[in-house]
Amino acid sequence: FVVTLLLNALLGNAALAQGVLVAPTPPPAQDILTRAASSVGVKRCLPAISRLSGMTVQGARSHDVLLDWDRKQPDDGPVFSLIGLEYTNAGVAASITAIPESGGACTVSAERISVAPYTCASIAQQELVGYQMTKLLPIFSVYTDPKEPNSSVSLIDSPPGCLVIR
């Protein structure tokens, strides 16, 4: 009891109430595309690039990026990227392109490219019900959803599987 009173007098009650200090959890590492775009001077489209890239690399074991940009005007020119993604059982590629517009806005395009071990016809039947199909070539079909006119899914027959571009 005397020790407790002495500690209270010397250190205050807060010292007795403190638990073991735990180091704060570091924030998740920034994805490579966001770091690369930022390092070359891209600012205006960086929030859109970062948001899309973060969603793209989520769940990947590792990823790397190929980046092309306007070296004379990095913040005013287009940014093109190709991202390679490694998953436990598959490899995927993604492309993110950002083009600054007047007034500070950005036009952004994103695609995910993968190979499915199924026929393109079976993917269309299971995943693209209600989509409209446009056949570009006998092996290449583009599907659009009337509810999302700015989005498409391309299926390219590549036996024994299907190349899928979303």
Where are these regions (language model features)?
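Bacterial N-terminal signal peptides
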Residues: V2-G12
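Boundary at the C-terminal end of the N-terminal hydrophobic targeting segment
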Residues: A14-G19
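N-terminal secretory signal peptides
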Residues: V20-E101
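Short, structured motif recognition centered on aromatic/hydrophobic residues
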Residues: V42-I49, V108-A110, C120, P160-R166
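Long, charged/polar, surface-exposed segments that mediate recognition or autoinhibition
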Residues: A90-I139
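Short, surface-exposed beta-strand/loop micro-motifs that present aromatic residues
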Residues: S95-I99, S151-I156
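Short, flexible domain-boundary/linker segments around small modular repeats
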Residues: L136, S141-E148
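Short, exposed beta-strand-loop hairpins at the edges of beta-sheets
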Residues: Y143, S152-G161, I165-R166
